[in-house]
């Protein structure tokens, strides 16, 4: 596999934006992401610039890790957010211990199945463990079977925590975690 796995640099915001827009056009994007393509497209460049700075190499609270092909094209990504004990997460739940939270998982369809997602997850977990987190979690839509199978394959287990999705009581997301080794 001739792919480079690395953290983004702050000046690579345009590539991060482009990959995000591709991800939001995926057939299961409505299950995988809270943001829509139209919403993301309407964001000003400054939004993506700030997002890149906050998750670039050297950032302390988040890290966006990408898979870069031999031609320089970004073909996959995952972002790790650090959540500190004593805070409240995006869904309004109390964070009881220092943890990582994986978001924005995406690999282009043409390179799925060759192990890139596993390598991206390994890099994300390594970054999180290096910051002293006790566990890493993610939230997955209950109907996103493909993602749930993959997360289980790489060691994430359901916690039983259910996150209601927006104003629709019929749709839920499930928390899955991997504990620090």
Language model: regions and residue ranges:
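Flexible, glycine-rich phosphate/dinucleotide-binding loops
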Residues: 14, 84-89, 145, 165
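Conserved glycine-rich acetyl-CoA-binding loop
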Residues: 104, 108-122, 130-131, 142-149, ...
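C-terminal "cap" of GNAT-fold acetyltransferases
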Residues: 134-137, 141-148, 152-181
């Amino acid at each position: 596999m001739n792919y480079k796995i690395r953290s983004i640099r702050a000046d690579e915001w345009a590539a991060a934006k482009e990959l995000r827009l591709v991800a939001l056009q995926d057939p299961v994007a409505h299950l995988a992401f809270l943001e829509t393509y139209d919403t993301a497209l309407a964001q000003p460049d400054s939004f993506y610039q700030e997002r890149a700075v906050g998750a670039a190499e050297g950032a302390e609270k988040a890290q966006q890790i990408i898979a870069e092909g031999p031609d320089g094209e970004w073909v996959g990504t995952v972002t790790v957010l650090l959540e500190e004990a004593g805070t409240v997460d995006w869904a309004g739940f109390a964070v009881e211990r220092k943890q990582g939270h994986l978001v924005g998982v995406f690999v282009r369809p043409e390179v799925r199945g060759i192990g890139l997602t596993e390598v991206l997850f390994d890099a994300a977990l390594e970054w999180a463990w290096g910051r002293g987190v006790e566990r890493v979690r993610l939230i997955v839509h209950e109907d996103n079977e493909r993602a749930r199978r993959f997360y289980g394959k790489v060691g994430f287990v359901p916690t039983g925590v259910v996150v209601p999705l927006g104003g629709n009581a019929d749709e839920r997301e499930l928390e899955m975690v991997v504990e620090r080794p």
